[in-house]
Amino acid sequence: MPAAYRPADCIIELVFNEDGHGVDFIFRYCNAEMATIEGVPVEEMLGRSFYEVFPNGDKKWLVSYADVALNGTKHILHDYSPEVDKCLTIHCYQPEPGYCACVLQATDP
């Protein structure tokens, strides 16, 4: 099944600063596929922020995730993730305002 038609692997709630910029996100839903890709058990992600789970995490994803959460836009992101040492393709859409749902595909670098 094409990634764009699969159910979300995770749903994240964006955290914004007083200027309205995305500064972090909280894992509100994660499935087994997400845990496999991230190499972290679901229970260690749920309810925690990205930077709690990945303290040295890259902020490059935040702008796109915030755009989805605030404006309802859709994005397809392609980039290397050093946190998991994989090349990721992430299909993002807004399930409801303030949230970003992601469907992930991972390949080895």
List the model feature ranges, each with a label.
Residues 1-18, 109:
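PAS/LOV and related PAS-like sensory modules
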Residues 8, 74-80, 86-90, 101:
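PAS/PAC sensory module
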Residues 17-22, 34-45:
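PAS/PAS-like sensory domain cap-loop motif
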Residues 37, 44-46, 50-53, 68:
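Alpha-helical sensory/transduction surfaces in regulatory modules that relay environmental signals to outputs
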Residues 57-76, 84:
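Soluble sensory domains of the PAS superfamily and closely related sensory modules
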